[in-house]
C-alpha cells in the first residue's frame, strides 16, 4: 500500500507489514525530487516485508539507477532488506556510529555480550534461550556487512532540489539519525519520536549513557521548527513539541518508579526490579510476559538504573555500574521522592518534575520499538 503524504518534494509512504510484531508495520518513506529518489528504511528481511516494499517501489516506478537508501538506525525492522537494494546498485547512507556498531556486532557476536550482562543481572538462562529463537531482530536483520557511505551530525544529503540535514539523535540506538528538510519544516524521526507508542531505550554494549543521550536528543529536536513529522512506525498526529514533553514525562515517571522499587527491594537484581514496575502488557503479570517482552523490559530497566547510578541516587555492589543497585546511605528523611526531585533539578528536568504528580506515574505505559 502506497500513500502520498506531501508534494514538492513528493513524499510517499509504503506500509511494510511486520507480522507477529506489536509494532504492526514500518513506515518506509520514498522521496522523489527532480528525477532522483531516496528510500528511508526497509523493513525486516522476510518475505512479507520484501513483497510489500518492492510492490510499493514498483508502483512508484522507482529507477534504482537514480536511487539512494538512508537508514535511520541499525535495527532489523529498518535495515533488514538493505542487501536486497544494494544488489540492485542502490547506495546506502547511514550514521557512522550505527554502521560501525552493526559491523562489529556481525563480526564479534554483540548479542552474546549483551546476554552476559543480562545473565549477570538475573535474566534466567532458559528464557534467554527461548528469546533467541523468537527474537525477530536477530532472525530478520542483515546477516552480512554491507557497503555504506557514513554520515555524521549536520551532514547534508542532496536529492534533486531538496536538501536533507542529518540530525544525530542517539538514545534508541547509539547512532540513530533523523532527517530534516528545514525549508519545508519536515522531520523524518525514525524511532526517535513516535506518536502512538513509546520508543524503547535500552542499554548498549560500550555505550554508557543511552537514556541521558535520549533525553538530550529530545531537547535537540525541540529546538527545530517542525510542522510535519514522519515517524518510523504507526501514525503521526498532534504537535511534536507536546509529544517531546510527553516522552520526557514518561521517562521521568519510569525513573521515579524504579527508584521507588529499589528503595523497597535494594538487594534485587535488575531482572527482579523490572518485574516490580508497570508495563503496558494488557494487564498480564510479569510471569506471563514472553521472553522477548522481558528482554526489552530488562534493557529499558537497566538504562534507567544506569541513569540513576550516574546521578548518584543509587550505588552498585559490583564495579560494573549496571549491576546490583543498592541505595546509597542517605538520611531517613531523604525519601526516594525527595532524592529524585533533587536529581531532576540538577539534570534540567525540574520543569517536568514540577508538572508531574505521583498520581500520573501509574498512568505511564511503554510499548517497544
Region locations from a protein language model:
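Metallo-beta-lactamase
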Residues: 37, 44-46, 137-142, 146, ...
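Positively charged, polyanion-binding regions of nucleic-acid-associated proteins
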Residues: 250-266
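C-terminal regulatory/interaction regions
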Residues: 261-369
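A short catalytic or substrate-binding loop motif that flags glycine-/basic-rich loops and adjacent residues
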Residues: 21-23, 149-151, 170-173
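Active-site HxH/HxHxD metal-binding segment of metal-dependent hydrolases
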Residues: 45-49, 56-157, 238
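Residue-level signal for inorganic ion chemistry
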Residues: 233, 258, 308
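Conserved beta-strand hairpin/beta-sheet module of binuclear metal-dependent hydrolase folds
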Residues: 4-64, 178-190, 195
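Histidine-centered divalent metal-coordination motifs
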Residues: 72-78, 95, 172, 176, ...
Amino acid at each position: 500500500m502506497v500513500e502520498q503524504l506531501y508534494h514538492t518534494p513528493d513524499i510517499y509512504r509504503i506500509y511494510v507489514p511486520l507480522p507477529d510484531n506489536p509494532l504492526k508495520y514500518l513506515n518506509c518513506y520514498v522521496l522523489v525530487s527532480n528525477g532522483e529518489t531516496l528510500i528511508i528504511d526497509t523493513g525486516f528481511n522476510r518475505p512479507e516485508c520484501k513483497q510489500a516494499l518492492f510492490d510499493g517501489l514498483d508502483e512508484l516506478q522507482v529507477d534504482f539507477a537514480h536511487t539512494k537508501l538512508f537508514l535511520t538506525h541499525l535495527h532489523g525492522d529498518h535495515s533488514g532488506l538493505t542487501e536486497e537494494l544494494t544488489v540492485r546498485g542502490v547506495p546506502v547512507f547511514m550514521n557512522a556510529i550505527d554502521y560501525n556498531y552493526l559491523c562489529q556486532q556481525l563480526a564479534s557476536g554483540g548479542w552474546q555480550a549483551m546476554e552476559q550482562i543480562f545473565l549477570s543481572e538475573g535474566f534466567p538462562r532458559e528464557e534467554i534461550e527461548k528469546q533467541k529463537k523468537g527474537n525477530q531482530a536477530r532472525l530478520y536483520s542483515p546477516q552480512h556487512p554491507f557497503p555504506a557511505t557514513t554520515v555524521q551530525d549536520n551532514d547534508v544529503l542532496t536529492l534533486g532540489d531538496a536538501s536533507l540535514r542529518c540530525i544525530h539523535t542517539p538514545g534508541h540506538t547509539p547512532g540513530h539519525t533523523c532527517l530534516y528538510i528545514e525549508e519545508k519544516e519536515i522531520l523524518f524521526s525514525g524511532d526517535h519520536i513516535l506518536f502512538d507508542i513509546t520508543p524503547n531505550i535500552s542499554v548498549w554494549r560500550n555505550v554508557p549513557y543511552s537514556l541521558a543521550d535520549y533525553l538530550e536528543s529530545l531537547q535537540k529536536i525541540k529546538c527545530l521548527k517542525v510542522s510535519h513529522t514522519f515517524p518510523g512506525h504507526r501514525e503521526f498526529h498532534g504537535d511534536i513539541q507536546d509529544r517531546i514533553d510527553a516522552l520526557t514525562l514518561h521517562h521521568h515517571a519510569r525513573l521515579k518508579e524504579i527508584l521507588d522499587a529499589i528503595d523497597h527491594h535494594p538487594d534485587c537484581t535488575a531482572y527482579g526490579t523490572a518485574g516490580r514496575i508497570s508495563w503496558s502488557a494488557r494487564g498480564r503479570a510479569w510471569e506471563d510476559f514472553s521472553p522477548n517482552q522481558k528482554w526489552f523490559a530488562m534493557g529499558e530497566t537497566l538504562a534507567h538504573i544506569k541513569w540513576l547510578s550516574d546521578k548518584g541516587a543509587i550505588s552498585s555492589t559490583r564495579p560494573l555500574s549496571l549491576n546490583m543497585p543498592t541505595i546509597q546511605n542517605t538520611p531517613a528523611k531523604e525519601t526516594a521522592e525527595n532524592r529524585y526531585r533533587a536529581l531532576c533539578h540538577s539534570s534540567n528536568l525540574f520543569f517536568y518534575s514540577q508538572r508531574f504528580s505521583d498520581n500520573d506515574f501509574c498512568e505511564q505505559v511503554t510499548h517497544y520499538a
